[in-house]
């Protein structure tokens, strides 16, 4: 009986996958095998049935992850003594496990949301779209970061298979149309408990008031409960639905901080971006994997960082060195300073909002595959290593179905005092992956930016599939007459087109940003 039921489900999956099979099977044998296993038949199923099939695909992928992790773990134990570089092996193993858990968590959440009463209304729909994009990004992060060697040869077949399944799941999801329900979409959940001691009439976050009700205080001088940021984060509860507030007093905190995904809803408030400083000096030259070079990494959903500095002191000569990596959905960075050189800010995954921040770096200094909006930020290019150019963005959208992209709105793009603009070229961005998506809207662009505006990553790759957009910018670097002539680049004239890159559209921000009490501009 069970065999018949399973065969029936497989048949249903084959009926729905026909519409997405060719596009995602041309390049990977694993995807071909997957779709061959499903045996395409018909695509005339209702959207409810498509939802049911997507749930089956996701549950199957969760089981595949569990099997892959067990298999890789056993294989690694057998070959551990043969590995020459134990540090690399440890980093690769940790990264593989972390990204598999990341993907698994997002798929489980997606299944729960698919079964919820609000799908496919917009808020629920955008949640799932974000998380399924994050599943794909998690797998690709593994492929990108794990070093070439025996370990990669062991895990790559499983990763390629999972990547193919993630692309199919995304395409299947996109085949379901969202429903617009203004009432559902505009409802903001009840004010979180952390606002119960603050005047809820305050439209915007009151940092001084929140400091007084902080759950814990960190201070270098001993006036707080803890003297390190890590100790305070360790004290935060796991899997909490209530916000946990950590007030970090003035001081330089020389420590590498990582918030696990089991600790959502953390708020860290400092005394100002020039007063509360978290600093580190890891780089690809000593940690090997860019992902783990971050001075501060947040993996928890709903993270809010306010009035502090995230700094990586490694200079421009040592390659990628992240100051801040954000890998949690619905994260907000407000009035913070992000300071580094190559890969300084890594908006890795999911929805993120940056407001009134100071961001400085050199090569690809805003990089990743998040859906991120930057509003009223100071984006400052600094002097790179000799012979290098500056690239402000390196966005890594993998497929047209991804829910990701960077939007730079009402920001100032300028040069630091040490940047020699006469000899160093600076570009708005280059495509890390072929569907790289970046929009610069209503911003000031200084004369540091090359007239071409944008530059290729390698040859002609991605120049017709990327989405680079500019809209109503000003300043000497905003002149578009000499911009690149790629088919993927456009100067937008229609505000309806530009609206796609706003908080409301790119982040679905109206459904979650109000809770943060951080000021934001929803549209243009």
Swiss-Prot record:
GO terms for molecular function: enzyme inhibitor activity; pectinesterase activity. Keywords: Aspartyl esterase, Cell wall, Cell wall biogenesis/degradation, Disulfide bond, Glycoprotein, Hydrolase, Secreted, Signal. Substrate binds at residues 290, 430, 432. GO terms for biological process: cell wall modification; pectin catabolic process. It holds the Pfam family PMEI. Expressed in siliques but not in flower buds. The active site is at residues 343, 364. It is found in: Secreted, Cell wall. Disulfide bonds join 357-377. Residues 23-172 are annotated as: Pectinesterase inhibitor 42. GO terms for cellular component: extracellular region. Residues 1-22 form the signal peptide. Pathway: Glycan metabolism; pectin degradation; 2-dehydro-3-deoxy-D-gluconate from pectin: step 1/5. The PMEI region may act as an autoinhibitory domain and prevent untimely PME activity during transport. This is Probable pectinesterase/pectinesterase inhibitor 42. It comes from Arabidopsis thaliana. The lineage of its organism: Eukaryota, Viridiplantae, Streptophyta, Embryophyta, Tracheophyta.
């Amino acid at each position: 009986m069970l065999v018949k039921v399973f065969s029936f489900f497989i048949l249903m999956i084959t009926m729905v996958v026909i519409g997405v099979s060719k596009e995602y099977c041309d390049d990977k044998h694993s995807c071909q095998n997957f779709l061959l296993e499903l045996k395409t038949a018909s695509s005339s199923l209702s959207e409810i049935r498509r939802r049911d099939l997507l749930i089956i695909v996701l549950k199957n992928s969760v089981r595949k992850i569990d099997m892959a992790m067990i298999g890789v773990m056993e294989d690694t134990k057998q070959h551990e003594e043969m590995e020459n570089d134990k540090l690399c092996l440890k980093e690769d193993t940790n990264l593989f496990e972390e990204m598999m858990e990341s993907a698994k968590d997002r798929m489980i959440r997606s299944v729960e949301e698919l079964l919820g009463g609000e799908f496919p209304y917009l808020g629920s729909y955008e949640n799932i779209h974000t998380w399924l994009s994050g599943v794909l990004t998690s797998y690709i992060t593994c492929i990108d970061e794990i070093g070439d060697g025996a370990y990669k040869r062991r895990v790559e077949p499983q990763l390629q298979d999972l990547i193919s399944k993630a692309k199919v799941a995304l395409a299947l999801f996109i085949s379901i149309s969202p429903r617009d329900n203004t009432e559902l979409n505009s409802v903001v959940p009840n004010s979180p408990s952390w606002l119960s001691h603050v005047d809820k009439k305050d439209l915007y976050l009151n940092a001084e008031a929140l400091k007084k009700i902080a759950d814990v205080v960190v201070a270098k001088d001993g006036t707080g409960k803890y003297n390190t940021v890590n100790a305070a984060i360790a004290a935060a509860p796991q899997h909490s639905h209530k916000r946990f507030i950590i007030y970090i007093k003035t001081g330089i905190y020389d420590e590498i901080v990582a918030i696990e995904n089991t600790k959502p809803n953390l708020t860290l408030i400092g005394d100002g971006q020039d007063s509360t400083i978290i600093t580190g000096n890891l780089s690809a030259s000593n940690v090997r994997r860019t992902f783990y070079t971050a001075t501060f990494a947040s993996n928890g959903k709903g993270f809010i960082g306010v009035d502090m500095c995230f700094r990586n002191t490694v200079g421009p000569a040592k390659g990628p060195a992240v100051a801040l990596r954000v890998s949690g959905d619905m994260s907000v960075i407000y009035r913070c300073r992000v300071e580094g050189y190559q890969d300084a800010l890594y908006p890795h995954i999911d929805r993120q909002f940056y407001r009134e921040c100071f961001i400085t770096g050199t090569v690809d200094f805003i990089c990743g595959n998040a859906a991120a909006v930057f509003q009223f930020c100071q984006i400052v290019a600094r002097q790179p290593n000799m012979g290098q150019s500056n690239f402000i963005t390196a966005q890594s959208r993998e497929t047209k179905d991804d829910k990701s992209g960077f939007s730079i709105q009402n920001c100032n793009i300028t040069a630091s005092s040490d940047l020699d603009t006469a000899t160093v070229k600076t570009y708005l961005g280059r495509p890390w992956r072929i569907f790289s998506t970046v929009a610069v809207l209503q911003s000031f662009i200084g004369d540091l930016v090359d007239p071409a505006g944008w530059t290729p990553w390698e040859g002609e790759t991605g120049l017709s599939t990327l989405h680079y957009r500019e809209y109503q910018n000003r300043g000497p670097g905003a002149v578009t007459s000499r911009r690149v002539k790629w088919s993927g680049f456009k100067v937008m004239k229609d505000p309806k087109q530009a609206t796609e890159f706003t908080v409301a559209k790119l982040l679905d921000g109206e459904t979650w940003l109000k809770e943060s009490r951080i000021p934001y501009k929803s549209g243009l």
